Amino acid sequence: MRVVVAPDSFKGTASADSVASAVAEGWRRERPDDEIVSAPLADGGEGTVEGFAVARPDGIRHDVEVEGPEGPATSAWLELPDGTAVVELASAAGIELWGTNQPFTASTHGLGEVIASALDAGATRLLVGVGSSASTDGGAGMLAVLGARIIDADGDAIGPGNAGLADAVALDLSSMRPVPAGGVVVLCDVSNPLLGPFGAAAVFGPQKGAEPDDIPVMNGNLSRLAALGTVDPATPGAGAAGGTGWALLQWGAEIRSGAESIGAELGIPAIVATADVIITGEGRFDGQTAAGKAPAYVAALAPGRTMLVAGSIDADVSAFPAAVSLVDLVGRDRALNDTIDALIEAGAALARRASEPDLS
């Protein structure tokens, strides 16, 4: 049997590569003669650069010092041989860096610094993953690093974060760095607009520490920025990453499904085409998964042949012939604190399921 293990990362506990390795180890304990192929995935969030680096060993990693909440921090981008640069917001301006207690001041400045580094090195195309954002600044920090001027009534640059947008009276993009010749693709797993009840502040603000009373203020600040631009704030994906989707569209980027685009770049359709079984997964399988996350993408590529492993499962899994929740398998404490061993057990459980008459 040929088995492809193609999971996303388990956010905060295990990288996609680690998940794939652990599941494969468990599977081999039960079915040692099977051929196992590791194909870790990402959907534009945490682990996007790492996922490409594992799948594309011909890439060159470039570390970049970025502005963090408590001083300099280190992010990175990956240079591919064709001139493409893979960039992720998560390590440059994400929750992992900023935490969830600065909803009004967290900035996308670091993302701009990483993009600028890639452009300085001669990148001819950008793939920008925008998941795991900490900010709701409408991408203003990123735009400023790339040469945009967002000014207040005195003609000065506005302050950082969503709070700074309250003072914005003009947006000047005339001095922005040009989009590279091969274009900019935003890798995104959501289709939310910038504003309103389904927008960046209302839907994602609480994940970044915003209180209920903060949401109308944050939405109003984003609305002020949107009024200064030319991109329709209702554009699907404009609300991604606290409005960074809108800012990248303003620059000239296009938005695409993160998992699907990354899968195509990494050759996932061809890899799974000849597999007997595919195992995919993510930290939490819930109602958002069908909106473009890795498990839904893989299941659509190989219907009836895709098994699921997740930290927790809170949605219908009828599309998968077998599914394992780490919380159900080993308990919540072990699932969170001993994730790799739990994944090994999950891999073994799925292998046993594959040996049952209705699946073998």
Mark where each language-model region is.
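N-terminal loops that bind phosphate or other acidic moieties
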Residues: 1-130, 134-360
